[in-house]
């Protein structure tokens, strides 16, 4: 699977990314929205860096986030994308 077409979300408060299959007959599988512009994150590691002004680099907040969201959701879910690209 490949993440393509990063953009601002439809509500303009989130990130939006498309999940595509691999191969010659690649097709879009789904669109995922994650994050929120009104809340801070540890560090914005997305290709767009739209909300990098909200970076806190606060390890205490990062630990608190992981304590609030302990479950590991499947790869390419909104939770997985948030943990990989924002926290």
What are these language model-derived features?
Residues 1-87:
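Arg/Lys-rich, low-complexity, intrinsically disordered basic segments
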